[in-house]
Amino acid sequence: MTQFITHKWLAALGLASSIAAFPALAAKDVVVAVGSNFTTLDPYDANDTLSQAVAKSFYQGLFGLDKDMKVKNVLAEGYTVSDDGLTYTITLRQGVKFQDGADFNAAAVKANLDRASNPDNHLKRYNLYKNIAKTEVVDPATVKITLKQPFSAFINILAHPATAMISPQALEKYGKDIGFHPVGTGPYQLETWNQTDFVKVKKFAGYWQQGLPKLDSITWRPVTDNNTRAAMLQTGEAQFAFPIPYEQAALLAKNKNLELVASPSIMQRYISMNVTQKPFDNPKVREALNYAINRQALVKVAFAGYATPATGVVPPSIAYAQSYQPWPYDPAKARELLKEAGYPDGFSTTLWSSHNHSTAQKVLQFTQQQLAQIGIKARITAMDAGQRAAEVEGKGQKESGVRMFYTGWSASTGEADWALSPLFASQNWPPTQFNTAFYSNKQVDSDLAAALKTNDPQEKTRLYKEAQDIIWKESPWIPLVVEKLVSAHSKNLTGFWIMPDTGFSFDDADLK
């Protein structure tokens, strides 16, 4: 007996030494370099796409969008709609757990939608959910949502990245601090959030999709300088970077260890003008500024060709988008219009940007130079996420300092209402939503509201066309470009890519 035990120990020691002779499997840790900071990890209270994209690490919705921006089931298995368009009955996926062990069920859906649709919570995404009259639990796997009025894009709202399912236990535990303590059903859970440096997430062992996630961790690292972001890829400090500085795209494409990807986008870049303030209350001034910008040159100077001049206020790939003849570059016409408007010598103003990365800086400097040619002196300020939240998103019309504002918008629901209503409806002036032009037109408001009440495609087309025709004519914006999305990644990273709305898809990401 003694001899047998000795042999077992010798065998065990031999096995241990043989294991030690081989390296342990390398951890699959990925660093993603992104262009700006995160504002919050509560998707219902984030106005920026990046914060919502990172929140997809922890959170999932009932529905989502695929790479073509078409609705797909996620935590829902299907739905039906009543004949009057008011009631949505949704069947839920069963056997799913939140990261704190709580069950995902109809009660959890109700807790989230009750919170989102309650104006007393003052959530930035409230406007998405204000049409919900009530949410009821039919049984643990079935939830019934009743709307105040028909809303034909409602499933797209439920597919929006903001509509995340948060653990009700976590909501109760953390309250208003839930943005610092995300708990969802997603593939990763929060490990560290250093608010000035990075968000690190780690694999959630109890994730409901078998075999996923394949990565051990993702570190989301804000890197505002374009050149530094690109350099991190080349040195191996990052395995994925977005956005890629356009001027470095060709260089990165030559790197045998990297893959450069230019993908379609619904990201429209524009400058809004505060039409409630002089001189932008004058239509001739707004026309003049549109004639003053050489968009073809802007595409080359700031975007290295990875963009196209805007032909409307809705990107062409969005349903019901209208295209128009682009504004020609005509500084002489611009000066003539300024003279007619009572500003023969131009004027001074401010031009703010919603981002401070290098591409935004180039757009600001280019625009500043173009405006100077027609006598307009623009003082430029590139804002970080905190400044933008405080000075632009957080202030109403009377206290707002916004005059000209360079920013971008992607309709993250994949449909026309979200491309128009948040930016042009009278009810969506900041701080409610993102109508930073403080634009208001009763016919536009009426058309946008009516388009949501009909399921007739021809009537929708008519209403959305009329609204866009009016907006294009009244010019509360200087539409600039629709971007192409340029990202790059290590060739050994697969399944990680950019969505057309500038969000990220990484469900099946792997490091090989």
From Swiss-Prot:
The keyword Nucleotide-binding does not apply. Residues 1-26 form the signal peptide. InterPro entries: Peptide/Ni-bd, SBP_5, SBP_5_dom. Keywords: Periplasm, Signal, Transport. Its main location: periplasm. The keyword Signal applies. It is found in: Periplasm. It comes from the Bacteria. Pfam families: SBP_bac_5. One of its GO terms (molecular function) is peptide transmembrane transporter activity. One of its GO terms (biological process) is dipeptide transport. NCBIfam families: PRK15413.1 (NF011942). The complex is composed of two ATP-binding proteins (GsiA), two transmembrane proteins (GsiC and GsiD) and a solute-binding protein (GsiB). This is Glutathione-binding protein GsiB. It comes from Salmonella typhi.
